[in-house]
Amino acid sequence: MNRQIFKEIQTLKRQILPNEKVILFGSQARGDARADSDWDLLVLLNKDKRNFREDYDRYAYPFDELGLKHNALINAIVYTKKDWESRPSLLKYNVEREGIEIA
């Protein structure tokens, strides 16, 4: 894991999502990432309904820009907590099993 990228993800999370949950999952969280591995983030919003475009622009795109700065791919998936908790899926299973909450 690239510690510099991880620290900048933490800083960005505190700036744009101070009261929301962000979870790192995938190879970076498991500790088996290669130098070219992407960064998978789950963003859980404390609101009832998502506005896909607005939420992407506000909460996912800043992580895209951070990835560009470091020549890395950072994928932020945005859900409301309500939607995330109401739908079982393989993704949810993997996030719950291997995820690391970003403080």
Predicted regions and their residues:
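Catalytic core of pol beta-like nucleotidyltransferases
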Residues: 1-21, 29-35, 46-103
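Short beta-strand->loop micro-motif that forms the acidic, two-metal-ion catalytic signature
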Residues: 39-44
